[in-house]
Amino acid sequence: MAEHPRQLQDPAHQPRSHQVVKAATAATAGGSLLVPSGLILAGTVIALTLATPLFVIFSPVLVPAVITVSLIIMGFLASGGFGVAAVTVLSWIYRYVTGRHPPGADQLDHARMKLASKAREMKDRAEQFGQQHVTGSQGS
């Protein structure tokens, strides 16, 4: 099957009947969508008119209930998140201790070596300072 190249026509060069069909289709689609949107708007206004007095009457009960339910849900979500975090951390520690080299182990080892070298350096400085202080007090 040979494909025929489609000619792209400028809308100004399209036949008048094609433009009329496009306009009629657009008007029909727009009109048919306008009716349900109007009905939905009217239904929303009626529902709000009926529900607003009920919300005002029951708000002393509803507001604390909503706050309580929200706090309970947030508590469950937070405890679940903390549980997942704890399992993740314990899994990482287990892999690190067993030598499976989890992500970030190199950084941890580098930081530990750097901290140990700084501790040794501070220990040496303290010993030097102590010796200088002892020799300085003996010479006086």
Curated annotation (Swiss-Prot):
Disulfide bonds: none
Keyword Membrane among UniProt keywords: yes
Coiled coil feature spans: none
Keywords noted in UniProt: Allergen, Lipid droplet, Membrane, Transmembrane, Transmembrane helix
Protein's cellular compartments: Lipid droplet; Membrane
Spans through the membrane: 31-51, 75-95
Entries under InterPro entries matching the protein: Oleosin
Tissues in which the UniProt entry reports expression: Expressed in seeds.
Principal place of residence: other
Keyword Ribonucleoprotein: no
GO BP terms, alphabetized: lipid storage; post-embryonic development; reproductive structure development; sexual reproduction
Protein topology in the membrane: Multi-pass membrane protein
GO CC terms of this entry: extracellular region; membrane; monolayer-surrounded lipid storage body
PANTHER family according to UniProt: OLEOSIN, OLEOSIN 18.5 KDA
Family indicated by similarity: Belongs to the oleosin family.
Physiological role: May have a structural role to stabilize the lipid body during desiccation of the seed by preventing coalescence of the oil. Probably interacts with both lipid and phospholipid moieties of lipid bodies. May also provide recognition signals for specific lipase anchorage in lipolysis during seedling growth.
Protein name (database record): Oleosin Cor a 13
UniProt source species: Corylus avellana (European hazel)
